[in-house]
Amino acid sequence: MPIHIGSSIPLMVEKMLTEMVKPSKHIPQQTLNLSTLDNDPYNEVIYKACYVFKAKNVADDDNRPEALLREALSDLLGYYYPLSGSLKRQESDRKLQLSCGGDGGGVPFTVATANVELSSLKNLENIDSDTALNFLPVLHVDIDGYRPFALQVTKFECGGFILGMAMSHAMCDGYGEGHIMCALTDLAGGKKKPMVTPIWERERLVGKPEDDQPPFVPGDDTAASPYLPTDDWVTEKITIRADSIRRLKEATLKEYDFSNETITTFEVIGAYLWKSRVKALNLDRDGVTVLGLSVGIRNVVDPPLPDGYYGNAYIDMYVPLTAREVEEFTISDIVKLIKEAKRNAHDKDYLQEELANTEKIIKMNLTIKGKKDGLFCLTDWRNIGIFGSMDFGWDEPVNIVPVVPSETARTVNMFMRPSRLESDMVGGVQIVVTLPRIAMVKFKEEMEALE
């Protein structure tokens, strides 16, 4: 169905071709096991992102980014060959296995055209997820096995294009995805090999469950909101300028002397978001709300994981408080709790306990039960795809737009870099937020107060 977006011309996207791109060199047939963190059922979701590239500044008769990217993908799979395989969760132990190599396999690569210019879509700034899906490859988790990676190139009338990526989170985290996408554009730009050599080594993050310890499942039966359940959800991208972040940090330091510790944007804005979300949802004040944080553990592993390790290398830390406490605590109080959670994540013994706990969750097929109204997770996407230049002839992407599963988006706030076209937003952040429509009104009031 045509979609009208910022133009009198309805948007129509025609997907012309999908082919299976295979590695440029022969890969022996093999079966690979994944780490405990990769096997976490909460990681078996498909994350997608749109990389928006403007047209070249000069006319070019050979304006075919899809040809360069298709060849680069084949070369990439010679290094990242597991991406060309197939994932399947085994019934026997509920672990994922990756089958790759041989004559089968490949990565779905789609070429599409759009009948409008990128400017009519404002380079996807504040685009809704349903529209963004037009520029993304189709990829789903399937109990019978599925491809973990797919790409789509959508060309626009202006000469610009969108590189759409879909990836199973079981294969990699944001760090790994960033390296993969930069390696792809490096190869498309003429480099002979990726700057960082990929390494599998998933056995380095495998836990050993202790039978006498019951598993901990986060976020069970949290505080209730009068606005949930609902089918009326909205997603907004909230802009927070550098001056607002600076003022909030200064106010936080006046509340509490953090001595030689640096307080980060993620910490102070995360604390402010939690307080704002609790108010917006009008959570039961005596009920528990849980803040979830993704904390990297690459350097906690002994020895540290090499740069080329692209599997999941983070653990989720949880800070539980009653809704009343979140409202009454100062920003500095919450920042202290966030810092404590991050310190715990960097403890080697804690990491082993977390791996053992996750192994039990997998084995027992446990999921979060009860209300999730008070569950609130933060994730930082500011460095997704930013591990080097992505310029392979069309300059750097002017915008990177994540598209996450709707069920996940309802409990997660994503930190994003502002669009490169917004010069007045240098040093600021954008927060992608999904809330019930009635709660979003109050949430935006709280965020406007920050400005």
Curated annotation (Swiss-Prot):
Keywords for the protein's UniProt record, in alphabetical order: Acyltransferase, Polyamine biosynthesis, Transferase
Tell me the active site: 169 (proton acceptor), 391 (proton acceptor)
Q: Which reaction does it catalyse?
A: 2 (E)-sinapoyl-CoA + spermidine = N(1),N(8)-bis[(E)-sinapoyl]-spermidine + 2 CoA + 2 H(+)
GO BP, sorted A to Z: polyamine biosynthetic process; spermidine metabolic process
Q: In which tissues is it expressed?
A: Predominantly expressed in siliques, especially in seeds around the embryo, and, at low levels, in flowers. Barely detectable in stems, leaves, and roots.
Gene3D superfamilies in alphabetical order: Chloramphenicol acetyltransferase-like domain (3.30.559.10)
How activity varies with pH? Answer: Optimum pH is 9 using spermidine and sinapoyl-CoA as substrates.
The domain of life is Eukaryota
**Among its keywords, does the record have DNA-binding?**
no
GO molecular-function term, one example from the UniProt record: spermidine:sinapoyl CoA N-acyltransferase activity
Name the top EC class: transferase
> How is the quaternary structure described?
Monomer.
Q: Which family does it belong to?
A: Belongs to the plant acyltransferase family.
Q: What is this protein called?
A: Spermidine sinapoyl-CoA acyltransferase
